[in-house]
Amino acid sequence: MVAVQQQVQAAIDEFVASGADDGLQVAVLHEGRVVVDAVAGTADADDVKRVDPSTLFFAASTGKGVATSVAHVLVERGDLSYDQRVADVWPEFGAHGKDGVTLRDVLVHTAGVPGLWPDITPGDLGDWDRVCAFIADQPPWWPPGTRTGYHALTFGFVLGELVRRATGRTLAAVLREEIAAPLGIADELHFGVPAQLLVRVARQGPDGAAPPPPEPGSPLDRAIPSGVQPTAAFANCPDVLRADVPSQGTMSARAVARMYAALLGHIDGIELVSPDRLATMATPTVSGTDQVVGIPTTSALGYSPARPGGVESRPGSTFGMIGSNGSAAYADIDSGVAVAVMRNRIVGDMSAVAAIDRIIADSLG
């Protein structure tokens, strides 16, 4: 296992030395044991503060995998069910024919409510009630359950409000109390970073090879309006980092990898979900053309079922999420690995993750 650590360390050192990245963290657990805990580069724009294992990174949609995991834990414990209708606990959401939308629809992005208002600002994301009221009153873009389309930001609000109404706790509170605290990672896995921990957040660097903004008025532009697109300025905004938005998260690699390892059942006797539940979570469920992004997509129950670096995935075994800033966290049931990669440069490619994933696949499966 020493060789795996050395190979990953050499790879991320090269990414920093080449200028492709400013700072990275990588954590890998295999059957519950840490086999990689590697860092490289700097955490600030002045190249002074070094990345360490406790550095927190804005991880964009990698956070969706964390939010999804909270939902599955709540289903496991009987607090939610996949076929529970959102409107049963959030009546306002049922407007405009959305009364049949279920938790399952939310998880696989078939609910039909991906849009936000055009001039939304980063500060608006912290106004939970306003955003939820807007979504509840939004006519669906398609008959719910009939098509899929990436709910880039609204995913976390719909899921979070369902959790809040059903349990009396925010999704962030459930994450902290039921998952992060028992696993000893409560300071490193966040929806809404506490003010006193903002100093530990790596500053995202220039937008590098980030993809161009969506065409004005396009479905993607309506789902991610210009004011809340994932640029470096957005990711560094204190309002964004402090906001409890379960569509995106701030975390360390070792924390989110430990969470995925716990889902696999390999951490200190802590069983977050049963083996049967785990199999359900990882099973590809919905395929089709994404109505927001416009490309073919396949989803498991809230996760991507593909390995982020192009390594061949095993359907029903691999599950996780990637972020638009090049971060990723995922697990593989068959090989028993849980992997997380955090980066602090907004980039539009997954080259670092691909290189790391290839090392992991060749060494551990």
Language model features with spans:
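Recognition helices and adjacent regulatory flanks at domain boundaries
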Residues: 120-125, 133-137, 141-143, 148-150, ...
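Short active-site loop at a secondary-structure junction
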Residues: 13-29, 46-106, 143-153, 244-247
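Catalytic loop of the DD-peptidase/beta-lactamase superfamily, centered on the K-T-G motif
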Residues: 1-42, 54-55, 147, 164-172, ...
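Solvent-exposed loop/turn segments at secondary-structure junctions
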Residues: 113, 156, 346-347
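Short amphipathic alpha-helical face segments that pack within enzyme cores
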Residues: 65-70, 154-162, 255-258
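Hydrophobic core segments within long, regular secondary-structure runs in both alpha-
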Residues: 128-133, 357
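Amphipathic, well-packed alpha-helical segments that form the structural scaffold of globular domains
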Residues: 13, 111, 136-140, 160, ...
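Active-site helix/loop module of the DD-peptidase/beta-lactamase fold
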Residues: 53, 58-62, 74-114, 118, ...
